[in-house]
Amino acid sequence: TFDEVIYIDWNSPTHSLLYDIKHNINFKGNFKHIVISPEIASILTNNDPQAQKCCEVLGRNIGLRRATGDYLVSTNIDIIHPRLEDLEKLIQQNDKNTFYTVSRRYTNWEQINNYYETNEYYHLDFKNNWKSLRNYLINVSTERHFDEKTVEGDDFSIINCCGDFQIATKEIWNEIRGFEEELIYTLYADTNVQKKAVMHEFGLKALYEPALFHIDHGKGGGGFLDGINKRANDPYRA
């Protein structure tokens, strides 16, 4: 889908996740891999034991500042991304002075595995045929309209889980200087970057197309409910 992909592996204890999944990836010469070891991650988060284990604001900024495209997307590895033609349509039809967040749709490994069991041909060559899975998910899914306010009166948390796909021009990302790097704990940082866009007099809008999918992983991940991350950012500070 993308002209350039930058993968930031943050704080993996032994080795980058990339080495476990690279056999399922078609590399096209546009992939950059940056590893932040546990030792460096600790230094960058002021040796704070309560910092988010996968510190999103720092990891995202490392990628954003090295990206070279006209439009930059901040996203996660548990997302099945839009089709290229749909993403190009988004860019062509929308305002270059607006910061966008695209609402994710839902899938899980049970649905994915059932699809490949039914379509054995695709299972045998997953990395070359995964697009068929995405087309299937698009056909059986609907737009996810799920609004959310982080705190009362908050006009910036315009959809739930807004950080799974945020897109804006490079000029907007540079003007707002990316994510706020004091927000090293979990929650609210994705809403905060949208607030920063508005404060810099850019537009802010939620979209429900193009279709993209979050692969459910239960309580594991970068959130607050899984027991890994013990502290949340202050929503009023954010």
Model-identified regions with their sequence ranges:
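Short, charged/polar "capping" segments at the starts of alpha-helices
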Residues: 13-20, 109-110
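Short beta-strand-to-loop acidic/aromatic patch adjacent to the donor-nucleotide binding site
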Residues: 69-82
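Short glycine/serine/threonine-enriched helix-capping/active-site loop
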Residues: 36, 100-105, 209, 213-215
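Active-site-proximal specificity loops/subdomain of glycosyltransferases
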Residues: 17-66
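Conserved glycosyltransferase catalytic-site signature
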Residues: 56-61, 79, 84, 161-165, ...
